[in-house]
Amino acid sequence: MTDLLFQSDSYLKKFETKLINVDLESRILFLDKTTFYPGGGGQPCDMGTLSSNHVNFKVEKVKKQGDDILHYISGEVPLPSIGSPMIGELDWDRRYKLMRTHTAMHILCGVVFRDYGASVTGGEMELLKGRMDFEFATLHADLVHVIEKSVNLEIDNNREVRVKILPRDELHPLGKT
């Protein structure tokens, strides 16, 4: 089981960890803790580096499997042995752009739900761009401009952003307050 550091500190860029398992064939490292987000819900995973004994390993992909986070390593450098201490470091430019995009998409979802009662049915994001699907029968260009203006007004309000991990059944009441 991997301790998910990103859930308590999304600004953590560098961390110390220990290698707890290795899949040599697939070049996957299992760590006791990580700040690498594995992706999910339309959001891409983090990338960066892991290092051990002054050897750097590029993290190309991160996935969640059960209670574990899998860190896929590129290259042909021999992998460290189980129990080795490691240092992880995020590609911070990528993470920060994903964070900004993620927050903007939450603002969009909040405005659309508050003003039109339409829920999100799907979405996908990349660095500084994203797509959201809403429960609208039809969506005209004029309405898109009205929504965009409302979203920009919310951004201009410069509200504090707080991170909370809630069960799904507690989410909708937040949109009605």
Predicted stretch roles:
Residues M1-T177:
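Active-/binding-site microenvironments in catalytic and ligand-binding cores
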